[in-house]
């Protein structure tokens, strides 16, 4: 079965409209999120469409900080070629014609990528593996599996799913009398900016202790501002009753019924030891009140704390991390310059 496939370049208006008409897409690929995370004024979007169809079949927002890099945008769990509907491959019953159409569209999309690319990254659901092209301008794909952790907010009170450790931490932190400072509206712009700076400092301290990557602070500030302005996010800080200094903080954004834990940090003090459990408990309650059915603990800057997430009753969900090509030293230095100018 041979299909004719059109290659398209979508304007920002066309991509925004396509996202609005495709409710299955997550927060991470929404136009406003991508622009705030990347610091770009506009992001090129490549698309393919099976002939005789009105809407694009596959769409790929291209974050290319240099002409040789196509990489994952900061604070984005999923990025890469997007389907016009979720489960196009793994759906029941199996739709053979749809599957073949996606294979053809994906092959055309791979061929349309800029030939200058030498290194490509993508994070995608597992079912994409069956229809990814084996070749890219940067070479063949290499894959690994990563996990996000999701908590179902619909079945029963989430607190019933917490293990004994988390319940004990929440009780101890509650007894400390920590003061809550929220940034969830733009009525006090200064408050949002001040809270964002406090969160940045807490995240930096946490990353320094864990030996993690450098914080994309500029991206985080823009995301907090954009999400709060749209009514799709909240930043919560817990302050010491003795010093009025923040001991823990986190930023959560939501879209289409899912709340996403984006970033968080805590101070290395006796008060901060249990504060993060109380903080997340408060944000989970906030997410339910915002009519979210799922709390996603992905935490784009958090590494090595999966056990902590599972202690809240969250269930691991696998996804693909894909890479093609290699970075030379010159490419790494060029990419670092971009990060220093726009993201750090």
Region spans (language model):
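Conserved acyl-donor/pantetheine-binding loop and adjacent beta-alpha core of acyl/acetyltransferases
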Residues: 64-80
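Aromatic (often tryptophan-rich) hydrophobic motifs at membrane interfaces
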Residues: 95, 221-334
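Well-ordered, non-membrane alpha-helical segments in soluble/globular domains
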Residues: 96-109
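Terminal substrate-recognition subdomain of acyl/acetyltransferases
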Residues: 2, 124-179, 294, 299-344
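A conserved beta-strand-loop-helix scaffold within acyl/acetyltransferase catalytic domains
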Residues: 3-53, 62-68, 127-148, 156-270
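Short, high-confidence coil segments that cap the C-terminus of an alpha-helix
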Residues: 42-45, 114-119, 233, 292
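ATP-hydrolysis module of ASCE/P-loop NTPase motor domains
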Residues: 111-127
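A short, internal acetyl-CoA/4′-phosphopantetheine-binding micro-motif in the GNAT/acyltransferase core
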Residues: 76-96, 154-156, 264-273
């Amino acid at each position: 079965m041979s299909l004719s496939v059109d290659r398209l370049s979508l304007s920002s208006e066309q991509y925004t409209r396509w996202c609005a008409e495709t409710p299955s897409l997550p927060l991470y690929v929404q136009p406003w999120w991508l622009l705030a995370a990347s610091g770009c004024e506009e992001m090129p979007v490549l698309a393919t469409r099976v002939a005789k169809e009105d809407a694009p079949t596959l769409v790929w927002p291209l974050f290319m900080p240099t002409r040789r890099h196509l990489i994952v945008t900061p604070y984005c769990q999923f990025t890469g070629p997007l389907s016009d509907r979720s489960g196009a491959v793994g759906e029941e019953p199996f739709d053979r014609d749809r599957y073949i159409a996606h294979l053809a569209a994906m092959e055309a999309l791979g061929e349309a990528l800029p030939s200058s690319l030498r290194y490509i990254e993508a994070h995608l659901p597992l079912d994409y593996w069956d229809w990814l092209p084996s070749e890219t301008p940067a070479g063949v794909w290499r894959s690994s599996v990563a996990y996000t952790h999701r908590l179902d907010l619909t079945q029963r009170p989430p607190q019933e799913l917490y293990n004994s450790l988390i319940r004990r931490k929440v009780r101890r932190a509650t007894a400390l009398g920590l003061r809550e400072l929220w940034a969830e509206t733009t009525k006090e712009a200064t408050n949002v900016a001040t809270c964002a700076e406090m969160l940045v400092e807490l995240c930096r301290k946490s990353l320094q202790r864990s030996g993690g990557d450098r914080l994309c602070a500029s991206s985080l500030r823009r995301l907090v501002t954009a999400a709060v302005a749209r009514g799709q996010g909240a930043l919560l800080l817990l302050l010491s009753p003795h010093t009025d200094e923040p001991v823990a903080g986190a930023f959560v954004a939501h879209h289409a019924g899912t709340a996403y834990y984006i970033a968080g940090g805590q101070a290395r003090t006796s008060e901060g030891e249990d504060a993060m459990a109380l903080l997340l408990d408060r944000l989970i309650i906030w997410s339910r009140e915002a009519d979210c059915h799922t709390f996603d603990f992905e935490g784009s800057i958090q590494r090595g704390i999966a056990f902590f997430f599972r202690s809240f009753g969250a269930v691991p969900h696998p996804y693909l991390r894909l890479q093609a090509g290699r970075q030379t030293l010159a490419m790494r230095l060029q990419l670092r310059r971009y990060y220093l100018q726009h993201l750090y």
